[in-house]
Amino acid sequence: MAQGQRKFQARKPAKSKTAATASEKNRGPRKGGRVIAPKKARVVQQQKLKKNLEVGIRKKIEHDVVMKASSSLPKRLALLKAPAKKKGAAAATSSKTPS
């Protein structure tokens, strides 16, 4: 058996763009609901406001829960951040060290 790993891995040839789009069309219907974006400016503005309110409310609730949990625990609560969605990013580390 050879020592170490091969320098260049064998790869499949890349699909052409037309073949890739054709395979996407042949995949069939996708799961989940679809939201059709509104065309009227007022409705767009209302949806944007609604989304921002929902996000704000959710963040406030999460913050309150964390504060309540950390105040009732004898030692400090360690929060972990979700990993970034960038390619090649290292694993996420917590901003506070768990003890």
UniProtKB/Swiss-Prot annotation:
Residues 1-37 are annotated as: Disordered. Residues 28-37 have a biased composition (Basic residues). Disulfide bonds: none annotated. Pfam families: DUF2462. Belongs to the UPF0390 family. May have a potential role in hypercalcemia of malignancy. This is Leydig cell tumor 10 kDa protein homolog.
